[in-house]
Amino acid sequence: MAAASFQPLKCLLLWVFFVITPPVKAVPEPGIWTVPIGSGAGSLFFRKTLYNSTNIKVKLISPNCPTPVKLTVKWYLRSHRCYNQFTNLEEVLERHHTNLDTTDNFCKNVSKPDFCDKNEDKNIDCNKDMHALPTLKMSKLVPKISVNQSAGSKNPLNQMDFDIVARTYQDGPYLFVLQVKGDENVKWNLSVTVSMKGPHGFISASDWPLMIFYMVMCIMYILLALLWFIWSACYWKDLLRIQFWIAAVIFLGMLEKAVYYAEYQNTDNTGVSSHGLLIFAELISSIKRTLARLLVTIVSLGYGIIKPRLGAVMHRVVGMGVLYFVFAAVEGVMRIIGAKEYDLVLLAGIPLALLDSGLCWWIFVSLAQTMKTLKLRKNTVKYSLYRHFTNTLIFAILASIIFMIWRTKKFQLVDCQADWMELWVDDAYWRFLFFIILLVIMFLWRPSANNQRYAFTPLIDDSDDEVEEFLVTDHLAEGMKLRGTKPECNGAPKPPATNIDEDLKWVEENIPSSFADAALPVLMDSDEEIMMTKYEMSKIE
């Protein structure tokens, strides 16, 4: 009854762990943007969380001005406390009827009461003979704190860097707005390159802790892989099938973290994220998540523990795994290539959530049946193994519920997300919780000298075999009463003879007087053993 009482909790954990848990942040914030712009174009918006003393550069490249024209460039740098304040800036501008034609409109109506750094560069000549436009002048409104940069900074102040138009003065979310205007009657186009490089490189302030997290997790997975390899090498003759599954999950987890770290490091160095590398990382993550769910499923079914094989059920397990991988891969790729289309990402996640719900129910039913079978067989070793696994799931449930309450209170139920530096925890926590559960599973199913005690044994254990042998031996004489009878050729068979003397005579001829003398001769003491016993007794006397 105690095991059954924990089944709803285990089902809740699987729901939390497989359905409610948010995916890893799809794309790190870039540090360099190259955007084409032409006559009649609107304003360009760049959002990013930046460290103090981050240099913002703007370059006007590849000008194409068949007719000479004078351009006016305006830019605004605005810091804000709330991370989610400008997620829909276009709607805010439309609501305030602001088109950035004047500085007052933007800084008073939209940016008030926060700090708004602004500047403009007028009368920039552009004609068909120009290959590059002159550098823009730096804003005069630069806080003094930005001048004193640390000596160990990755991006020290360089007076010869004339492309810098602004510099941040504190850590936090920033909005950079750029507008290029010219004569409305003249056609022109060019490309704008905006770069934001801080003390740690091009990576954003919200992504840098996540990059360190992936590096640490990659090292931890490497250590786990080495430990599991040493364990398996020491007891390679007695390895169970489930231990090969665990090795595969460890390898995929190590590869996943390495690819994510490589992507974040590449973004930090180059300022541009690689969609190909991100898609590869998402595919690796989908394979790992699929294999982890299959591992939990076959463990709950008792594969290798109470069943030597799953038979036709294995086809259903593989089918569910293939479906899950397809849906997980589609959802992950949609988060990368269609990150701005939230509705499409949500639509891609619906089949995945439904499939996770089905897996949750299947695991719940199978795990309950497996523990019931072990309890009926009185197999204390295997039952204790599943009990420890249950306690691990209960711990994960409590940890998940506590974190979800904290996350909802911190990020969902507030109008202003001021604690933007803790956003990386929302992505890293579920990965770390998965790592902890995997670590416990490794410990429970670790290779050892007594590895086969967790393996499948036919119906009964050794202790039950001893009881069964005793029962068979004790009742062996009862089975020897049966004798062959000759069928009658004509009519109904004769009733058995009731002559007691004939029965007794048959018993005396076919059954020894002492059953022990015939059945257990090896238990009788030999003459030599009797003599040795008497000799030992005489020595004692």
UniProtKB/Swiss-Prot annotation:
Listed A to Z, the keywords are: Cell membrane, Disulfide bond, Glycoprotein, Golgi apparatus, Membrane, Signal, Transmembrane, Transmembrane helix
One GO biological process term is: detection of mechanical stimulus involved in sensory perception of touch
Q: For this UniProt entry, what is the primary localization, expressed as one broad class?
A: membrane
Disulfide-bonded cysteine pairs: these are 65-116, 82-416
Mode of membrane association: Multi-pass membrane protein
- Glycosylation sites per record: 52, 109, 148, 189
- Per the record, the domain of life is Eukaryota
Kindly indicate where the leader peptide sits in this chain: 1-26
Identify the GO cellular component terms for this protein.
Golgi cisterna membrane; Golgi membrane; plasma membrane
| Segments crossing the lipid bilayer | 210-230, 242-262, 294-314, 317-337, 345-365, 385-405, 423-443
Which stretches of this protein does UniProt put in the Lumenal compartment?
27-209, 263-293, 338-344, 406-422
Q: Which Pfam families match?
A: GOST_TM, TMEM87A-B_GOLD
User: Where does this one sit in the cell?
Assistant: Cell membrane; Golgi apparatus membrane
Taking the record's annotation, the residue ranges forming a coiled coil are: none
Per the record, ranges on the Cytoplasmic side are 231-241, 315-316, 366-384, 444-541
Which InterPro entries does the record match to this protein?
A: GOST_TM, GPR107/GPR108-like, TMEM87A/B_GOLD
Protein role: Potential monoatomic ion channel gated by mechanical force, implicated in normal touch sensitivity through the generation of mechanically activated currents. However, a direct channel activity is debated and an alternative could be that it functions as a chaperone for an unidentified mechanosensitive ion channel. Could also be involved in cell mechanosensitivity regulating cell adhesion and migration. May also be involved in retrograde transport from endosomes to the trans-Golgi network (TGN).
**Which family is annotated?**
Belongs to the LU7TM family. TMEM87 subfamily.
User: By what name is this protein known?
Assistant: Transmembrane protein 87A
Taxonomy of origin reads: Eukaryota, Metazoa, Chordata, Craniata, Vertebrata
Give the gene that encodes this protein: tmem87a
